[in-house]
């Protein structure tokens, strides 16, 4: 069970009938708890989201014996701003994100007819880029085609900056000193691993994500992650798998950073030739 404010999620991997019973019992216990404390339980807002292609999709019930109803099944659920779909490909979320960011981008361009980079780029960084990057550690396991849609919002915006219309995308980024979205995604992923490895987060909530192995400095940094084989290519794109090779290859001086800002600066310094690049082979 996970609780955030008034939002509660009960989840379980279903591999047997016993797992189904345990999940149903958890739902029943939660309902009984609300009744005991005289809390109103909104059955209409309670949904079941079945994850995975081979999910048996059992029915689950909510309520007491007198008013016990089958819980509705949803195919798309918004959780803390991220749209979750049954296949976890985040196609719907990425499309919605691109639509929202493009709308904001077009609003900026419509209201600022003088297309000076010193005006447009700060606006893009503060109003558009946060939309494109929100929750990307979660949803960046999408296909390269989907992720290109995110990059294209920045690509199209920079084409409107005065004086650099005819430059290639990467040259425009370098001229504007604006990192590619792909590069920032990679750095963002590495920053999350850094926070976990250096325990910036509560260790109890993150200790199960990675298995760090002790190594001597002659074989790279001392926070390398054990990589377990997976026979499903889809899983390799999830955060806990996709970051391993890149993280394990980081030089010791980058991983040795003591603060978040120091890590960012050292990472940028080490990869200064890639900051404005695309097609960095991270997602392949």
Residue ranges of predicted features:
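Short, charged alpha-helical motifs in flexible N/C-terminal segments and linkers
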Residues: 31-49, 78, 146-215
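Short, conserved micro-motifs composed of acidic
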Residues: 25, 39-76
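Catalytic palm subdomain of template-directed nucleic-acid polymerases
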Residues: 8-32
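Extended, well-ordered alpha-helical segments in internal regulatory regions
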Residues: 127-142, 191, 195-201
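Short, conserved catalytic/metal-binding micro-motifs enriched in Asp/Glu and His
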Residues: 4-6, 34, 77-87, 101, ...
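Low-complexity, glycine/alanine/valine/leucine- and proline-rich hydrophobic stretches
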Residues: 212-246
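Basic, alpha-helical interaction scaffolds
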Residues: 70-137
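Conserved, non-catalytic sequence blocks in retroelement Pol enzymes and Pol-derived host proteins
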Residues: 15-23, 88-96, 111-122, 140-150, ...
